[in-house]
Every structure is written in C-alpha cells, then in structure tokens.
Amino acid sequence: MNVFRLSGDLCHLAAIIILLLKIWNSRSCAGISGKSQLLFAMVFTTRYLDLFTSFISLYNTSMKVIYMGCAYATVYLIYMKFKATYDGNHDTFRVEFLVVPVGGLSVLVNHDFSPLEILWTFSIYLESVAILPQLFMISKTGEAETITTHYLFFLGLYRALYLFNWIWRFSFEGFFDLIAIVAGVVQTILYCDFFYLYVTKVLKGKKLSLPA
C-alpha cells in the first residue's frame, strides 16, 4: 500500500465520520441528501459482495466492513431515526437517471462478464456520480452548512488522492485499471467547482452556495 491510497482511505473515513457526527450531534439530517447516501450504500453493497469469499488483508476486510456499516447507519439515521428532519422537498434528484444508465454501462463495459465483476463495475461507475443528488440539493437550497462542506471536501479529496494512487501503481507496479481511472476522473471533475468554492469561501469563514 502506498501513501496516496492510505491518505485517500483516511480522508474517506474522515468524511464518513464527519457526516455521522454532524447528524448525530445536531439530531438532524437537514441539508443532507438521503438519495446520495442510498446510492453510496448501494455502491458499497455491490462492491463488497466478495467480503465472505475472498481475503486480501485484515486492513482491506476491516475497511470494507466499516464502509458498509457506516453507509447503512447513515441511511438509517436519515430515513428512520431523524426522518422528521429530512428535507425531502429539496432532495428531488431523479436517481433513476443515474442508476439505469450505470447499470447498462456496467453490463456492456467491464473486465469480465460474471455477476460479481459486473456488480463491482456497477459500483465503480455509480460512485463516480453518487454525489450528484447532494450537489443538486445544495444548488436548490442555495447554501450548505459548514460541516456539510467539510464532509464534501474530504470526500472529494479522497477521490483525488486515489488518482495519484493509480499513477503511483502504474509507475511502480505496472497496474492499470482503465474503468476505475476514468470513473475516478469523472468523480473528481464533479468536485472541481465545489473545491474552488470551498477554498474561496468556506476557508475564509463564508457560507458556501452553489449557483442554481
């Protein structure tokens, strides 16, 4: 494991913890897209179906369990425990416009036409666009809480660091996964506008807002 992957994993974990603490401490999921969190839960579920059939390392298995557990916990908090605070009126992105094309693409473009491989590919494609309902929700409400922007920043940073991880692995291990790289680039591009606003506004103590 190289420093970029480890740093990326830590940023990903930090983003998840920030989100869970934000919801739990405020006893509210206001400003959080439940649809994005459902998509992330779907991502981890379809990606880690090999949890009980293959073992790479204790670290790898532990992170899989943590990601899945936190994803399910987040969905539970939004749609059950703090359901009364969920802003469904603004969380209106049509997720079928993401899931259906991604499902079709994963069947057509994959490394191996087997159920587990197709589902893994589906998770890679879906993760690249899963944040869109959250960004759409922010654009509709006009602004986002500072703690929510921190969550998004670490989530975007995780993906950017993984791009460097792939460059490292190609340079030193000869590893090249075009599907993961293209999906990662797409995901990072989606965060570019947010990164700019985060640096120019949030870090200067201003509220973040996305253009409607």
Swiss-Prot record:
Stretch list, region Interaction with the K-D-E-L motif on target proteins: 47-48, 159-169
Chain positions of site Important for recycling of cargo proteins with the sequence motif K-D-E-L from the Golgi to the endoplasmic reticulum: D193
Cross-referenced Pfam families: ER_lumen_recept
InterPro entries tied to this protein: ER_ret_rcpt
Region named Important for recycling of cargo proteins with the sequence motif K-D-E-L from the Golgi to the endoplasmic reticulum: 204-207
Localization per Swiss-Prot or TrEMBL: Endoplasmic reticulum membrane; Golgi apparatus membrane; Cytoplasmic vesicle, COPI-coated vesicle membrane
Main localization category: endoplasmic reticulum
Domain of life: Eukaryota
GO cellular component: cis-Golgi network; COPI-coated vesicle membrane; endoplasmic reticulum; endoplasmic reticulum membrane; Golgi membrane; membrane
Record keywords: Cytoplasmic vesicle, Endoplasmic reticulum, ER-Golgi transport, Golgi apparatus, Membrane, Protein transport, Receptor, Transmembrane, Transmembrane helix, Transport
GO molecular function, one term: KDEL sequence binding
Signal peptide: none
Residue intervals annotated with topology Lumenal: 1-4, 53-58, 111-116, 169-178
GO BP terms, alphabetized: protein retention in ER lumen; protein transport; retrograde vesicle-mediated transport, Golgi to endoplasmic reticulum
Site features described as Interaction with the K-D-E-L motif on target proteins, chain residue numbers: R5, S54, E117
Record carries keyword Protein transport: yes
Membrane topology: Multi-pass membrane protein
Cytoplasmic topological domain residue ranges: 25-32, 80-92, 136-149, 200-212
Role according to the record: Receptor for the C-terminal sequence motif K-D-E-L that is present on endoplasmic reticulum resident proteins and that mediates their recycling from the Golgi back to the endoplasmic reticulum. Binding is pH dependent, and is optimal at pH 5-5.4.
UniProt free text on domains: Binds the C-terminal sequence motif K-D-E-L in a hydrophilic cavity between the transmembrane domains. This triggers a conformation change that exposes a Lys-rich patch on the cytosolic surface of the protein. This patch mediates recycling from the Golgi to the endoplasmic reticulum, probably via COPI vesicles.
Stated family: Belongs to the ERD2 family.
UniProt-recorded name of the protein: ER lumen protein-retaining receptor 2
Species of provenance: Xenopus laevis
